[in-house]
Regions:
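Acidic beta-to-alpha connecting loop that harbors the catalytic carboxylate
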Residues: 7-9, 35-36
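Short beta-strand/loop motif that positions the catalytic acidic residue
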Residues: 3-5
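Catalytic histidine neighborhood in serine/cysteine hydrolases
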Residues: 24-38
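The feature captures the conserved acid-bearing segment of alpha/beta-hydrolase catalytic domains
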Residues: 1, 22
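C-terminal, loop-rich substrate-recognition/catalytic regions characterized by aromatic stacking residues
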Residues: 38-39, 45-176
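Active-site phosphate/pyrophosphate- and oxyanion-stabilizing loops and adjacent acidic/basic residues
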Residues: 18-19, 57
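Extracytoplasmic/secreted cell-surface and envelope-processing proteins
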Residues: 13, 40-41
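Conserved alpha/beta-hydrolase "acid-adjacent" motif
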Residues: 10-16
Length: 176
C-alpha cells in the first residue's frame, strides 16, 4: 500500500491517509507532501514529475517486478514545512514525537482580528472554566470567511482562532 497525503488537506483526506496507513497490516508506505492547500496538491498531482517520482517506481516494483529499489525506500517520508525539507522514518508516528496538550482559554491573545481572538494554554482549566461564544456565520460574511480591511483581503477576520503565547524555541508540529 502506498498512501500519499498532503498537509494542506488535513481536514478530510490527510486524516484518512494516516488512519488507513495505521490500520493496514501488509507492506505499507506513507508520503505526506508539503502542499499547502487543495489547489497546490492538485497542481502537484497534475505534473508528470510527480507521477515519475512517486507513483511509477511503486507500480514498476509491484506490478512489473522491476528491481528498482522501491523496497529500500523509507516507510515514511514527510515534508517538513517551514524548513522546506523532507524527513524519512521507519514508523508513524515518528519515534521522537512528544505529546503536549493545549487547552482553550478565555483570555484574548491580542494577536489577530478574528471572530474570537482566543488563546491556547498548557495549563489545564478548572472544571468550571467558563465558556466563550461568537456569532457564526458572521453577519458581515458575504464572500466566505475572507474579510476585507485597509490592507486588502484578511483571511482570518471571519474565522475562529486560538493562539499560543510566543514560543521560546522553534517547534515542529508533526504527528497525530
Amino acid at each position: 500500500v502506498l498512501s500519499i497525503g498532503h498537509w494542506g488537506k488535513m481536514g478530510l483526506h490527510l486524516r484518512g491517509n494516516i488512519l488507513g496507513y495505521e490500520k493496514v497490516k501488509s507492506e505499507k508506505h506513507l508520503v505526506v507532501t508539503g502542499a499547502k492547500d487543495v489547489f497546490e496538491a492538485h497542481d502537484q498531482f497534475d505534473h508528470i514529475w510527480y507521477h515519475e517520482q512517486e507513483l511509477l517506481p511503486f507500480y514498476d516494483y509491484h506490478l512489473k517486478g522491476k528491481k528498482n529499489g522501491w523496497n529500500k525506500r523509507p516507510k515514511v517520508r514527510l515534508h517538513v514545512g517551514g524548513r522546506d525539507e523532507w524527513r524519512e522514518d521507519a514508523v508513524w508516528p515518528p519515534k521522537e514525537a512528544k505529546y503536549k496538550s493545549y487547552y482553550l482559554s478565555g483570555k484574548k491573545s491580542g494577536s489577530v482580528a478574528s471572530l474570537n481572538d482566543g488563546s491556547l494554554s498548557t495549563k489545564k482549566p478548572a472544571a468550571n472554566g467558563g465558556s466563550t461564544d461568537w456569532d457564526y456565520p458572521h453577519a458581515g460574511w458575504k464572500l466566505g470567511t475572507v474579510g476585507f480591511g485597509p490592507q486588502g483581503p484578511d483571511p482570518v477576520r471571519g474565522c475562529v482562532t486560538f493562539t499560543t503565547e510566543p514560543m521560546d524555541q522553534d517547534v515542529e508540529i508533526t504527528g497525530p
